[in-house]
Amino acid sequence: MAKNIQAIRGMNDYLPGETAIWQRIEGTLKNVLGSYGYSEIRLPIVEQTPLFKRAIGEVTDVVEKEMYTFEDRNGDSLTLRPEGTAGCVRAGIEHGLLYNQEQRLWYIGPMFRHERPQKGRYRQFHQLGAEVFGLQGPDIDAELIMLTARWWRALGIAEHVSLELNSIGSLEARANYRDALVAFLEQHQETLDEDCKRRMYTNPLRVLDSKNPDVQALLNDAPVLGDYLDDDSREHFAGLCKLLDAAGIAYTVNQRLVRGLDYYNRTVFEWVTNSLGSQGTVCAGGRYDGLVEQLGGRATPAVGFAMGLERLVLLVQAVNPEFIASPVVDIYLVAAGAQTQSAAMTLAERLRDEMPGVKLMTNHGGGNFKKQFARADKWGARIALVLGESEVADGTVVVKDLRSGEQTAVAQDSVAAHLRTLLG
């Protein structure tokens, strides 16, 4: 017997019961994006490797350790995208979408990082991201955060996520802070682990993310980035906080919050949760005003975020399972006997025409009534339609509410109206 070929570790199959959950959540997210005027952009999964090195930073964990990079037959270095912002910016520059224009864009799809697989974090994972180009005020930063807050309310998880904010200032302000932080860390090298020692000179702000408790204790005495902000960044951040206060969105200023990618400036934010065990990030983003120019375009202000869908699905399942408890089908059509199958399929097609969006499944493969009703239960149907030879002859169909057990014979010409009443 041939050996079974299995999925690559950390790259998962999503089976029909799971994809139904994903589709419901994704549909909610897309509806909210549409209500804010955001448009979808579809991007390649594979990009030229230099794109990510220039955008993300060569001395980041993503570029150094996590990217899936390979040479194609022409000898070009290509990479499976580890995140979406760089590709979105590349597309905007390439197609002339950005200079002197406003764009509100979103994308969704798989990303790839060679990390140790764990719950909610995989080597192939899915993100939904939104990017705004051409607007530089704190009001658009606030709009993005308000948009995400509306998601949480729509998904019924608002009480289980909290917002953390920070400003990491301009490039110049961050450079001054970097020097002060390195000087502090050099005085306490005996407390640093090997990873922090390596980062101390290549990317010292990443030391602030260390999970080492000894390093975290040390950082309580470290310089604070907020003390090094330039006046424009300080004013921008104050404006953002004022807008969020007016909108009633609670937040915590976390002065250790930095982002893992080098292109960020000024606003950075994360939505975090404690409802999945240890604290985890659900959605994160910030401003990256220099990235378009860094990738060859003209200077363009930009801000955006990305959300990991695996972790979001886990959170919704954990705290609001009712949201995803929707049936696979609404109506199951039971046909009694081979002679009625053609009439059943004709009726099903007519109902699909008259009731767009209804999920209706017709029984195929025969079976007695007991087996067919068992299949209706398996698919989670609320209503069964029963069509036998007598119903075909007199133009009726039996409508059975599978929750209450009540049933009635209804003329086929008026069954759609009757079903709409039952389904609400």
UniProtKB/Swiss-Prot annotation:
MF term (GO), any: ATP binding
Keyword Zinc-finger: no
PROSITE patterns xref list: AA_TRNA_LIGASE_II
Any single Gene Ontology cellular-component annotation: cytoplasm
Superkingdom of the source species: Bacteria
Protein's cellular compartments: Cytoplasm
Database matches in Pfam families: HGTP_anticodon, tRNA-synt_His
Reactions this protein catalyses: tRNA(His) + L-histidine + ATP = L-histidyl-tRNA(His) + AMP + diphosphate + H(+)
SUPFAM superfamilies, per the entry: Class II aaRS ABD-related, Class II aaRS and biotin synthetases
Classification via InterPro entries: aa-tRNA-synth_II, aa-tRNA-synth_II/BPL/LPL, Anticodon-bd, Anticodon-bd_dom_sf, His-tRNA-ligase, HisRS-like_core, HisRS/HisZ, HisRS_anticodon
GO BP field: histidyl-tRNA aminoacylation
This protein's UniProt keywords: Aminoacyl-tRNA synthetase, ATP-binding, Cytoplasm, Ligase, Nucleotide-binding, Protein biosynthesis
Enzyme class: ligase
The keyword Repeat is assigned to this record: no
Similarity comment: family membership: Belongs to the class-II aminoacyl-tRNA synthetase family.
PANTHER family registered for this protein in UniProt: HISTIDINE--TRNA LIGASE, MITOCHONDRIAL-RELATED, HISTIDYL-TRNA SYNTHETASE
Assembly and oligomerization: Homodimer.
Protein name, UniProt field: Histidine--tRNA ligase
UniProt lineage: Bacteria, Pseudomonadati, Pseudomonadota, Gammaproteobacteria, Enterobacterales
Gene: hisS
